Amino acid sequence: MLRFFSIALLLLCFSNANAQPFPFQKGDHVSILGNTLAERMQHHGWMETMIHSRLPGHELSFRNLGFSGDELTLRLRSSGFGSPEDWLKQTNANVIFAFFGYNESFAGEEGLPKFEKDLDSFLKETLSKKYDGKNNPRIVLFSPIAHENIKDPNLPNGIENNKRIDLYTKAMAKVAAANKVFFVDLFTTTLNLYSVSEKPLTINGIHLNEFGDKLVAQIIEKQLFQNEGDKKDAAFL
């Protein structure tokens, strides 16, 4: 019971770098880009559910374009698959959720200058487009989650990995602020969640299980909405 209370309290008491809630608009088409964290979110659907519960009258649509291994400048696809821009146009994206930074973090501290430059270019270029044919998109940039130590002798404990992810999360926050882009720090909050949860949030330290997916969705919900607005229950939806 104490651990459950600690998790609930922690979800309420996170820090938020954004001054205002994210400005969703009725009929928004949300396209989700990024690495395995983004791709695996389609398995349980908690993030979309949490957002719909806040905005049941907005008629939002979500399209998951996440792809394992994706980086800002490296997105391997079969020939004829179409470019990232093609798919953002096909989905009429006017809101983009971008999950990057984990794969890039393996370049270490020496890779930070290139990463910051690539991220700045990605944000500026993306913000300049009109994928829905009318408006420049609004972006939410998400940091990687922390690496969880699930105490399996066959898996790394995540200490070195988290040092790198921490550096890249801070770099992402800086670049997002410079471009006036909404930023969600998943690293710091998940690192704290791991310490108070009695159950693992991941299957292997880095990929969320359903319990972890739900808690991360709650983090995202609270950062996007900053506890403003009514939340509808499952029966209403």
Positions of PLM-derived features:
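Catalytic nucleophile-elbow at a beta strand-turn-alpha helix junction centered on a G-D-S/GDSL motif
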Residues: 29-42, 68-73
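Structural signature of transmembrane alpha-helix termini at the membrane-water interface
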Residues: 12-15, 51
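Alpha-helical cap/lid subdomain in secreted, periplasmic
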Residues: 24, 45-63, 70-237
